[in-house]
């Protein structure tokens, strides 16, 4: 049955001063729960157009829009929280994109303020100044709705103050919670420990243990960073990992091993990629028991699966098969050592890949799940995990979007870890000279072009929000040292020589301000 209806058009009005680009050439839609779904949405300078939502009645549109003096960033239009519906088949409805973005942000800020007030927080004069400016400009934009150009200009200004207000609301509320709560001595501030092999080990331990109380050790079957863990099936190379494990233990660092199953393109050997589903089940059972058993109770947690919400899927399994593999691995890990936590790690928090229909570089063969839908499927199928994990590399979203997404994990009733977070410190002479990270000609993404202090700002603000939430137990920065970081120039150290970036010092001062150091 056809689900095609009429055209809903979001017409952009380019009031920006600069050359752009001002609107990304693709967009996506989300349902009322903010889960991305596949639709026929398209985006161009002529407009964002959608006419087939595959039966989803109410939806938002997610566009990357250049909001000068804030950033070229993804922003939601959700009709002020009421969401959109398609016009009847054969019909057409046109909306002013600028106005819809502004309206949606104004109404969100109202909801967030009221929500936070119930906990005793009172917004400051500074916060309310931004809120009032955005509200007044929104009222002006409403009065000029018949004049699209004028309405768009006022809406853009409204959105600017509204976005700044959103971030200030969340940060101020977080600081309020921190000020009234007890020091969280059990809060984990962590990082991956691969730096042990990327720089002088003694220097690594000096700088790492001064900063972190939590570390992850990776067990990729094949890896470009250091010795492969399982290049040949069954030939497990523990020795390299055991060295750093033992050193971290000597320094009283809590350790997580990761991952037991991650079928991503760069770490999946052909012998695994070519296994049938039944063969994978047998392998997962044996592998999990052997790896978890090797460390006994020495690990705090094992990451059971990574990015398995139909994103990392070189083994090309169905959603049901992935759920079953996850369940089996959790059962075996618990049976092997019930005292060790079982963590599920998710990437791509906003699930743009659902619209792009991609498993990494592969075209997706089956319907895909967002991280939240994947986690709900695990709960519904009785999968016995104990920690919910979400990566949060700078997501081309503002801080308000980040915390609202993370709040969705509360319903699963497990502690939440921000398993991998990171942002760039921007290009430097070395990255420009070797071409690994050059100066961009596009509008900046967030506040200004990335530099060391902006990286430190984002780190400080994200960690502040996370620390204020009792249900978030850890934040893990990825990675420690450049040029080996996943995010280009995303390390806390400039090079293996150990030069500290502003973000390294900022994180240390932040912990001191909380009484953790």
Please name every model-derived segment:
Residues 134, 215, 248, 291, ...:
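Conserved, mostly hydrophobic/aromatic
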Residues 195-209, 281-292, 364-379, 401-402, ...:
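Short, acidic/polar
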Residues 2-34, 70-135:
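Amphipathic, heptad-repeat alpha-helical segments
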Residues 210, 214-231, 239-350, 428:
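Substrate-binding cleft and catalytic face of glycoside hydrolase catalytic domains
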Residues 273, 294, 303, 308-328, ...:
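Aromatic-rich peripheral "rim/lid" segments of glycoside hydrolase catalytic domains that contact
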Residues 192-196, 220, 260-262, 304-307, ...:
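Active-site beta-loop-alpha junctions enriched in small/polar residues
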Residues 172-223:
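An acidic-aromatic substrate-binding cleft motif
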Residues 225-256, 319-345, 352-356, 368-443, ...:
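Glycoside hydrolase catalytic-domain groove-lining segments
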